[in-house]
Amino acid sequence: FLIEEIKSDTPTSNWLTAKSGRKKRCPYTKHQTLELEKEFLFNMYLTRERRLEISKSVNLTDRQVKIWFQNRRMKLKKMSRENRIRELTANLTFS
């Protein structure tokens, strides 16, 4: 088994050492989360205008708000699925 050294001028080494263009992950503050959750209770889907309003009020980008809502809908879907499974297994166990 032959292992070659990665030369510093190869595309592979450039890829390995390249810095990601993404921003550092920054968790939401309690205030931001509370405001986003409150809005989610009223609307699971936002219009662009509403998303821009919310993003300004909680000091986030509209993209961050959009992604937060996408993730929150997926979380709700997952929780709903888990509850249905739990109910089915409970019914099978006790019937």
From Swiss-Prot:
Annotated GO CC locations: nucleus
Superkingdom classification of source: Eukaryota
Transmembrane segment boundaries: none
Cross-referenced SUPFAM superfamilies: Homeodomain-like
InterPro entries in UniProt: HD, HD_metazoa, Homeobox_CS, Homeodomain-like_sf, HXA10/ABDB-like
A single GO molecular function term of this UniProt record: DNA binding
Record-annotated DNA-binding residue ranges: 21-80
Entry annotated with the keyword Nucleus: yes
Annotated CDD domains: homeodomain (cd00086)
Entry keyword set: Developmental protein, DNA-binding, Homeobox, Nucleus, Transcription, Transcription regulation
Subcellular location: Nucleus
Family of the protein in this entry: Belongs to the Abd-B homeobox family.
Functional summary from the UniProt entry: Sequence-specific transcription factor which is part of a developmental regulatory system that provides cells with specific positional identities on the anterior-posterior axis.
Protein name, as recorded: Homeobox protein Hox-D10
Gene name per UniProt: HOXD10
